[in-house]
């Protein structure tokens, strides 16, 4: 499956989903973006 990396827009509920090692952060509204897990 495709995934998006650091700083890219994501959506926890419907995708696009973050690559391994990233999580979808929605703090910077209105968009969610992938951030590093570490």
Curated annotation (Swiss-Prot):
Disulfide bonds join 3-19, 10-24, 18-34, 26-32. Coiled coil: none annotated. Keywords: Amidation, Disulfide bond, Ion channel impairing toxin, Knottin, Neurotoxin, Presynaptic neurotoxin, Secreted, Toxin, Voltage-gated sodium channel impairing toxin. SUPFAM superfamilies: omega toxin-like. One of its GO terms (molecular function) is sodium channel regulator activity. The keyword Secreted applies. It holds the Pfam family Toxin_7. Its main location: secreted. The keyword Disulfide bond applies. GO terms for cellular component: extracellular region; host cell presynaptic membrane. Expressed by the venom gland. It comes from the Eukaryota. The modification Serine amide is found at residue 38. InterPro entries: Beta/delta-agatoxin_fam. It is found in: Secreted. Belongs to the neurotoxin 07 (Beta/delta-agtx) family. 02 (aga-3) subfamily. Insecticidal neurotoxin that induces an irreversible spastic paralysis when injected into insects. Modifies presynaptic voltage-gated sodium channels (Nav), causing them to open at the normal resting potential of the nerve. This leads to spontaneous release of neurotransmitter and repetitive action potentials in motor neurons. The presence of a 'disulfide through disulfide knot' structurally defines this protein as a knottin. This is Mu-agatoxin-Aa1c. It comes from Agelenopsis aperta (North American funnel-web spider).
